[in-house]
Amino acid sequence: MTTLTAQQIACVYAWLAQLFSRELDDEQLTQIASAQMAEWFSLLKNEPPLTAAVNELENRIATLTVRDDARLELAADFCGLFLMTDKQAALPYASAYKQDEQEIKRLLVEAGMETSGNFNEPADHLAIYLELLSHLHFSLGEGTVPARRIDSLRQKTLTALWQWLPEFVARCRQYDSFGFYAALSQLLLVLVECDHQNR
C-alpha cells in the first residue's frame, strides 16, 4: 500500500473489527450506506488491490438497502455465520482453525494491551486481532514508539492472523448466502495481504 496513511489503515481495521464483533444496529446500518462511507470507499478503491473487494462490498450494501427487514436479516446472517456450530459457519476464532489461541494474548502483552471486559468473547476472536492491528498502525503514525519495534509486532500479528484468515474467508463465502459478510471478509483478506506485503 502506498497511498493510504498508517492512520487510514488503522481506521479500516478498527471499522472492520467493529463490524465483525457484533450485529449491526440501525445507526451502523444507516452509516454504511451513507455518502460519507461512499467517500471512504472511493479512497480505498484508489488502491488497486482493494478495488474489486470494495466494489463487491458496495454492491452488497446497495442490495442491503432494499432488503426487507435489513437489520433483522443481517442479524440472522451474523448469528448463523459467527455464533453457531462450525458445521455451516465461519467461526471468528483462531482456535476454530486449529491455531494457538494463546498467540494473540502474547502479542497483546507485547503491545502493552489487554482485552476489554466489555467484549465478552475469547481473546482469539478476529476483532481482537483487528483492534491490535489498528492500534499498531495508529502507533506507527504517532511516532512515539520506535517504528522498527511496532513494525515487528505488526508483522507477527499479520502472520498469526494469516494462518487462519483465508479459511475463515472461504467459509464466509461458502455459507453467507446474502453475501454481506462474505464481501466484508474478502476486503479484510485483501487488506491483510497488502499490509503483510508492505514490509
Curated annotation (Swiss-Prot):
Compartment(s) of residence: Cytoplasm
Coiled-coil stretches noted in the UniProt entry, renumbered to this chain: none
Cysteines engaged in disulfide bonds, as pairs: none
UniProt xrefs under InterPro entries: Chaperone_TorD, DMSO/NO3_reduct_chaperone, HscB_C_sf, TorD-like_sf, TorD/DmsD_chaperones
Domain of life, source organism: Bacteria
GO BP annotation list: protein complex oligomerization; protein folding
Keyword Chaperone in annotation: yes
GO cellular component: a single term: cytoplasm
Main localization category: cytoplasm
Keywords from the named record: Chaperone, Cytoplasm
Function: Involved in the biogenesis of TorA. Acts on TorA before the insertion of the molybdenum cofactor and, as a result, probably favors a conformation of the apoenzyme that is competent for acquiring the cofactor.
Family: Belongs to the TorD/DmsD family. TorD subfamily.
Protein name, UniProt field: Chaperone protein TorD
Protein source organism: Escherichia coli (strain K12 / DH10B)
Organism phylogeny: Bacteria, Pseudomonadati, Pseudomonadota, Gammaproteobacteria, Enterobacterales
